[in-house]
Amino acid sequence: MPNIKSAIKRVEIAKVRTIKNAAAKSTLRTTIRRFEESLSTDAETAKLALNKATRALDKASSKGLVHKNTAARKKSRLTKRYAKQFAQVG
């Protein structure tokens, strides 16, 4: 446990940020999971869920919650899954 006042404050700030980041990551994972579940429904619902997931990944990336390359990779994979599921035949 730190003795210096500023160090004590930094520990408290770190705790608060850890909780916030955990909540934000949980929300991000939930959004992605909802998209994956929506793939079994119609294309319109899945498209809306894909847009929400993409937006959530962009926000998380801009806030430093996930690395920009990680966000780009996940968006790419989600988009590929959507395209494969609802590909136009013929």
Swiss-Prot record:
Swiss-Prot/TrEMBL keywords: Ribonucleoprotein, Ribosomal protein, RNA-binding, rRNA-binding
Keyword hit for RNA-binding: yes
UniProt GO BP: translation
InterPro entries: Ribosomal_bS20, Ribosomal_bS20_sf
A molecular-function term among this protein's GO annotations: small ribosomal subunit rRNA binding
GO cellular component: cytosol; small ribosomal subunit
Function description: Binds directly to 16S ribosomal RNA.
Family label: Belongs to the bacterial ribosomal protein bS20 family.
PANTHER family: 30S RIBOSOMAL PROTEIN S20, SMALL RIBOSOMAL SUBUNIT PROTEIN BS20C
Name the record gives this protein: Small ribosomal subunit protein bS20
Species this protein is from: Desulfitobacterium hafniense (strain Y51)
Biological classification of the source: Bacteria, Bacillati, Bacillota, Clostridia, Eubacteriales
